[in-house]
Amino acid sequence: MPDKPTKEKLMEQLKGGIIVSCQALPGEPLYSETGGIMPLMAKAAQEAGAVGIRANSVRDIKEIQAITDLPIIGIIKKDYPPQEPFITATMIEVDQLAALNIAVIAMDCTKRDRYDGLDIASFIRQVKEKYPNQLLMADISTFDEGLVAHQAGIDFVGTTLSGYTPYSRQEAGPDMALIEALCKAGIAVIAEGKIHSPEEAKKINDLGVAGIVVGGAITRPKEIAERFIEALKS
């Protein structure tokens, strides 16, 4: 297992490349109770030249670590109803991810009510206090959320949840305006969410982001097939 990179070293590694998100949830075609599928996705991503992997769950991350030394952005998706945040939503999930020695832990940093009752700045501070050497990424949906996370000391701000909170932009395609505004504010941005084409990725890269995560457009064959099929119907 490689040593955990510093922020500077990781930014160097991610610059101008694609981080591939390799995830499948229960009910999706590529989900398997016994695992084994996501490391194959990660292997394909590595062979293609990906600079990092984003992965969900302790099991998938461990399996991916066994086949690649690429830096991993790790999350744990777990529902805490009635609250909406489910991406690394409490310290329990942070603890589980921190034990895996991954490059980055990503967590929900939206302004929505949280299961632990904390505001996001307090949660970030608690995580930083407990794991001072762990790089952290805030999954946000608006500029203000990104700013709050940045001011609380987060290392990277991801546009992951734009369009997935009721108060954020709801259009198709990546939130270019949000990505650009965060970059202009001097924040290390990892662009993520609704990036469907190499052309979009190129435009985003030109905005000066720290990294780009592409998931569904690469690793969800059902979603890819649906886009082709819909195109023929329209």
UniProtKB/Swiss-Prot annotation:
InterPro entries documented for this protein: Aldolase_TIM, NanE, RibuloseP-bd_barrel
Assigned GO CC terms: cytosol
EC number: 5.1.3.9
Biological-process GO terms, alphabetical: carbohydrate metabolic process; N-acetylmannosamine catabolic process; N-acetylneuraminate catabolic process
A GO term, aspect molecular function: N-acylglucosamine-6-phosphate 2-epimerase activity
Keywords: Carbohydrate metabolism, Isomerase
Pathways per UniProt: Amino-sugar metabolism; N-acetylneuraminate degradation; D-fructose 6-phosphate from N-acetylneuraminate: step 3/5
Keyword Isomerase: yes
Pfam families registered for this protein in UniProt: NanE
The UniProt record lists the keyword Isomerase: yes
Enzyme class: isomerase
Catalytic activity of the protein: an N-acyl-D-glucosamine 6-phosphate = an N-acyl-D-mannosamine 6-phosphate
Function: Converts N-acetylmannosamine-6-phosphate (ManNAc-6-P) to N-acetylglucosamine-6-phosphate (GlcNAc-6-P).
UniProt-listed NCBIfam families: PRK01130.1 (NF002231)
Protein family membership: Belongs to the NanE family.
PANTHER family referenced in this protein's UniProt entry, alphabetically: N-ACETYLMANNOSAMINE-6-PHOSPHATE 2-EPIMERASE-RELATED
Record's protein name: Putative N-acetylmannosamine-6-phosphate 2-epimerase
Organism: Streptococcus pyogenes serotype M2 (strain MGAS10270)
Gene: nanE
